[in-house]
Amino acid sequence: MMLGLVMSEKESASEVIFRIEDEIAKSEGNFDSIFVSLKERFNTAELSTIYSLLLGGIKAPNFLRRLICEIDKLREKRNLDDLIDFILDCDNKNFSEPAEYLNLKVLCIKVISNYKEIKAVPSLLYCLNDRKANYKLRLAAAEALGKIGDKNAVESLIDVVSDEDEKSVYVRESAAIALGMIGDSRALDAFVGILEAKKSFLNKFTFLKERILESLSKMDFAGNRRALNAVKKALEDESPQVRINAIETLMNSQMDEAVGMIKKMLLDCDVEVRKNAVIALYNLLGDEILEEIIQDETLSEDCKTEAQGILDGDFEEDYE
């Protein structure tokens, strides 16, 4: 490779790009030698500058994908601005397949989230709130906001998760997950409202309720009667997975009523729900409740088998 003069003061940015574009054309999709050569010749600051030029000028999707991953490894702050510019750029770089550009933007957002820099939040909020954008981009933006954890994103995430007109339930799910990661109590009312809603689509597509219960399990709602009643209602949901998630939420709630509610689930019609109730009670009460379950003649054999298995240590890793 002829990359020795890439940082020459006599070379313009366009010449740098042209030089590496020539190497890309010869590489046949294997870009290892290009990046190995760059890393051998240039220090971190110089690499950051080169990566910035390449991200702004190269149009080869496969190379850009590798470049974005290399930027993630380098994680220089100056390249964060480059990544933000990339996701906000409306130009599709003349890609023959628009899906390629979309996938690169989604990858950029994931890398941006790894920086965990608050300065990226406004741009991510823009992506999240852009109803014309592909749902994959908005979903990635929601997940990134949760990972960064800035509470300035909470209101927008609440708006998305509460929006009954939102076409993509997946975006609402991602917003719910992000709110759980941030852990701000302002989301409680929105979560409870959705669990209380009698919407037919929620019964058909239960994933949103599942995600909300998962997020509630990470939040402190002790003393919030409305939230407790909503979780209690979820124990009666038609979906076994919703009932399982409600059990886990109660287990993590540290509320006095939790044990009694979970004990009732030992009589649930679904075997997996019953097993999860056993596990939850063990996590709350220890070995003593397992002995009680084994001796209880009113309980099913699967409950007893699950309890005995935990006592015997057969599935120890599952309960740690």
Describe the function of each predicted region:
Residues 8-21, 41-55, 76-95, 117-129, ...:
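Amphipathic alpha-helical scaffolding segments comprising HEAT/armadillo-like alpha-solenoid repeats
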Residues 28-29, 60-62, 102, 118, ...:
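Alpha-helix N-cap/helix-start positions at coil->helix boundaries
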Residues 32-36, 51, 65-69, 84, ...:
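Hydrophobic core positions within HEAT/HEAT-like alpha-solenoid repeats
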Residues 35, 53, 64-72, 79, ...:
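Alpha-solenoid helical repeat scaffolds
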Residues 206, 214-218, 225, 229-236, ...:
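Alpha-helical adaptor scaffolds
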Residues 275, 279-316:
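Leucine-rich solenoid repeat scaffolds
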